[in-house]
């Protein structure tokens, strides 16, 4: 699938689910460890630099960030997990909002999980995968920073990840290689996003933000 002609814009950021946009239409949530390249991946897929904040401090993104494709379709940047050094009360509110979002958000169509290809399947990655399996939420894993490995090593990592995901027994789990630096894997990613968001497939010569 070619990159669809969508224009992605920032919508809002929340700490509590009650402040989220109306639970209508469809959403895809991006999740991952704080240094897995999540924000960079969103910017690459949107073809808009700086759309999602890229911080040099892992865990700086503490809120759930919503981006609008159109009135009925959204991308959601979930807080990165793993390194966040924030006050306890804020951290508790953050975790509660994240859990509530995954549990109750009716418009959620799938989770796009970003994992560093060199350090995949951390403990928190496993928690997210198990949560999706338990809730029957579609999951697509993007092994980021694939440019850091040789092609052979990257393909082996993908095969190992595919085998590991198969162990969860979900037909809606998939995996790919991705590199924001090389912009590789974008069409494969949009194939998944387009299916989940029910994007039209015609007239797809333009790129997002064009």
Curated annotation (Swiss-Prot):
User: What Gene Ontology terms for biological process does this UniProt record contain?
Assistant: division septum assembly
Its needed co-factors are: Mg(2+)
Keywords, A to Z? Cell cycle, Cell division, GTP-binding, Magnesium, Metal-binding, Nucleotide-binding, Septation
Residues binding Mg(2+) are: 39, 61
Q: Has the keyword GTP-binding been applied to this entry?
A: yes
Q: Which residues bind GTP?
A: 32-39, 59-63, 77-80, 144-147, 178-180
Domain EngB-type G residues, every copy: 24-199
Cellular compartments per GO CC? cytosol
Return any one Pfam family short name: MMR_HSR1
Q: Which InterPro entries match?
A: G_ENGB_dom, GTP-bd, GTP-bd_ribosome_bio_YsxC, P-loop_NTPase
Which Gene3D superfamilies does this UniProt record tie to the protein?
P-loop containing nucleotide triphosphate hydrolases
A GO MF annotation of the entry reads: metal ion binding
Domain of life of the native organism: Bacteria
PANTHER family reported for this sequence: ENGB-TYPE G DOMAIN-CONTAINING PROTEIN (PTHR11649:SF13), MSS1/TRME-RELATED GTP-BINDING PROTEIN (PTHR11649)
Please give the NCBIfam families that the UniProt record associates with this protein: GTPase_YsxC (TIGR03598)
State the family it belongs to: Belongs to the TRAFAC class TrmE-Era-EngA-EngB-Septin-like GTPase superfamily. EngB GTPase family.
Listed HAMAP family? GTPase_EngB
Q: What is the purpose of this protein?
A: Necessary for normal cell division and for the maintenance of normal septation.
- Protein name, please? Probable GTP-binding protein EngB
Organism of derivation: Methylococcus capsulatus (strain ATCC 33009 / NCIMB 11132 / Bath)
